[in-house]
């Protein structure tokens, strides 16, 4: 069976209604994307914590519907637009979707990733390229963090250079658990991973078991009291600013912290918030993203 993708762009306030109508009228699947992705106008979907969502949600959406090649896309879209209450049918383009071995195609897109000196992030269907590598076996899944994003890479490089045997580590916003697992493989003692998403917590636990890494995971309310030798948080700039006092309090005096999920243009603003507690600066930049790192002062 052959398929086509129907692609339409429209204001965000109409995207959800149109996507629902397309599904009701026979589309096989529908996704909504930020039409401004990878441009200066790109925005978080629901807005970062601390900002007004109405001002930061996607302003321009792209609706992509997978349809059977026998369906008339113009008729389908017109009916969906009418069902959604749109004043007119959006303009659209069609993309042919070739038959594929989707499992093989997906696997081909995820090759082993070399990070730092000895780190390799390796999907389960590959072998580590180096016999002496520090290997993290990780498949793409529900939670953020496979090593491909610049912020994850930066944090991993920092951890490889920073973690000392037996140190305690907190990974706040752990996603897939990749940073927590790496910390453990670098010789850390007690390692804790925290995330607001229960699915991420479950994914991280699964990944830790696969990598034989003894890491404790939980939601924010499960975060243990006390301080850590190392804290790493790869989130976004606004949550990092909102949580500055809390995250800084989790670092032992003299301990180290690394922050990422921060664009280079946001670095000074984030650093200024943490400067009250931490001697902090840009540690490294990669593809427009930075990792801020510093040491908690003995008293503040």
Curated annotation (Swiss-Prot):
It is an enzyme of class 2 (transferase). It comes from the Bacteria. GO terms for biological process: methylation. Its EC number is 2.1.1.-. Coiled coil: none annotated. It catalyses: L-lysyl-[protein] + 3 S-adenosyl-L-methionine = N(6),N(6),N(6)-trimethyl-L-lysyl-[protein] + 3 S-adenosyl-L-homocysteine + 3 H(+). GO terms for cellular component: cytosol. Methylates ribosomal protein L11. This is Ribosomal protein L11 methyltransferase. It comes from Burkholderia mallei (strain ATCC 23344). The lineage of its organism: Bacteria, Pseudomonadati, Pseudomonadota, Betaproteobacteria, Burkholderiales.
């Amino acid at each position: 069976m052959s398929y086509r993708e129907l692609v339409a762009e429209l204001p965000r306030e109409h995207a959800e209604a149109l996507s629902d109508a397309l599904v009701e009228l026979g589309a096989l699947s529908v996704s909504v994307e930020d039409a401004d992705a990878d441009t200066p106008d790109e925005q978080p979907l629901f807005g970062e914590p601390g900002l007004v969502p109405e001002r930061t949600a996607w302003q321009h959406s792209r609706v992509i519907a997978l349809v059977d090649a026998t369906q008339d896309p113009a008729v389908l879209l017109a009916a969906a637009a009418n069902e959604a209450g749109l004043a007119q049918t959006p303009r659209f383009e069609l993309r042919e979707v070739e038959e594929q071995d989707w499992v093989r195609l997906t696997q081909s897109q995820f090759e082993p990733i070399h990070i730092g000196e000895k780190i390799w992030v390796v999907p389960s269907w590959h072998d580590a390229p180096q016999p002496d590598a520090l290997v993290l076996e990780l498949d793409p899944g529900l939670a953020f963090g496979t090593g491909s994003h610049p912020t994850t890479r930066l944090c991993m490089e920092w951890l490889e250079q920073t973690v000392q045997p037996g140190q305690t580590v907190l990974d706040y916003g752990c996603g897939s658990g990749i940073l927590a697992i790496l910390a453990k493989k670098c010789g850390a003692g007690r390692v804790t991973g925290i995330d607001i998403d229960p699915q991420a917590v479950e994914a991280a636990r699964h990944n830790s078991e696969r990598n034989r890494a003894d890491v404790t995971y939980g939601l924010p309310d499960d975060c243990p009291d006390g301080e850590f030798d190392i804290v790493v948080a790869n989130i976004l700039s606004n949550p990092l600013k909102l949580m500055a006092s809390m995250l800084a309090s989790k670092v032992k005096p003299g301990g180290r912290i690394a922050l990422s999920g921060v664009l280079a243009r946001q670095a000074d603003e984030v650093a200024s918030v943490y400067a009250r507690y931490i001697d902090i600066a840009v540690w490294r930049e990669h593809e427009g993203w930075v990792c801020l790192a510093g040491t908690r002062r003995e008293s503040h």
